[in-house]
């Protein structure tokens, strides 16, 4: 139908985001099974980014989705710039010169079409968010997910090489720094957030026109999400209670060790 044709780019973008979201959620599950809570939380960070983009696209529709997909040309040029800077000899080869020229021509055309604000990492959202250089935090606010900023920040500790990643860990139930191996501690954090983010990724796919089947499907997803979140929460609480150690017990162990 003509209505469905108007959502070609939006459907394509949301389908791809959903597929990638499922893949990342599977990675989270794999890490949880192996006891790597920090790594799982870091992968959830990616899933959160995917879900936020999906929600923003779902809210703003086809025009923004076209811009989002066209922004691939900007990313291609950024990669080309790095290639030429880091591998000048290879970049100077005839085959690569032709490809680089084509990439630059497509980049120039898309920037001329959308304007200079399109050049920034999230430039595809500049017009719709009313920001010259939108950031991911702006996307979170647009998706009504600003309350997730703290979780996102904590999850980032395990991604980068900052000192916070060396001194704290969601897996450490004793609060004395990150464990040196897999642990059962902290697994519930990534599990709960992943369950919620998966529903956020799937929601925009249902589109603006709600049918009985779509409502039933969404209701089922929410029930599964709530059940998973409850199970993870109960597991985390049980682990916390089982691993809690009083100061008296610690002091007694220290005295025993000194003998």
Predicted features along the sequence, with ranges:
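Residue-level recognition of alpha-helical structural elements
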Residues: 10, 33-40, 64, 144, ...
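Amphipathic, well-ordered alpha-helical segments in soluble domains
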Residues: 17-27, 43-46, 50, 151, ...
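Short, conserved micro-motifs enriched in small and acidic residues
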Residues: 15-18, 37-41, 185, 189
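Long, hydrophobic, well-ordered secondary-structure blocks that form the structural core
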Residues: 27, 33-81
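N-terminal, Lys/Arg-enriched amphipathic/low-complexity engagement segments
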Residues: 1-22
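Secondary-shell segments that build the walls of catalytic and ion/ligand-binding clefts
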Residues: 1-6, 73-259
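Short, amphipathic alpha-helical segments
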Residues: 22, 41, 94-97
